């Protein structure tokens, strides 16, 4: 049995051209995914940086310095005037 060429077979050029289009499409998809991941990472780093900058640990109070000193002296006087009562549990 011999294989005879038929007239309805697809030419060689069409096969290579179609596979070339698929390769270009796959490259575009891979490039898009890599770009999306890269943009997401940059966004996360920026958000973490902004959060850490805003919550860096320096706290401001609206109390005057005189009020702070007065409250400290009151606490010291209060603890000196009241005798400590110790409770013992049995």
From Swiss-Prot:
Residues 1-27 are extracellular. Residues 49-90 are cytoplasmic. It comes from the Eukaryota. It is a single-pass type III membrane protein. Its main location: membrane. GO terms for cellular component: cytoplasmic vesicle membrane; plasma membrane. Coiled coil: none annotated. The chain crosses the membrane at residues 28-48. InterPro entries: SMAGP. Keywords: Cell membrane, Cytoplasmic vesicle, Membrane, Transmembrane, Transmembrane helix. It is found in: Cell membrane; Cytoplasmic vesicle membrane. May play a role in epithelial cell-cell contacts. Belongs to the SMAGP family. This is Small cell adhesion glycoprotein homolog. It comes from Xenopus tropicalis (Western clawed frog).
């Amino acid at each position: 049995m011999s294989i005879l060429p038929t007239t309805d077979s697809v030419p060689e050029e069409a096969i290579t051209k179609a596979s070339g289009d698929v390769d270009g499409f796959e490259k575009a998809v891979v490039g898009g995914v890599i770009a999306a991941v890269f943009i997401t990472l940059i966004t996360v780093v920026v958000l973490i940086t902004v959060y850490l900058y805003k919550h860096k640990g320096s706290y401001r109070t609206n109390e005057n310095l005189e009020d702070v000193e007065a409250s400290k002296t009151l606490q010291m006087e209060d603890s000196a005037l009241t005798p400590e009562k110790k409770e013992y549990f049995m």
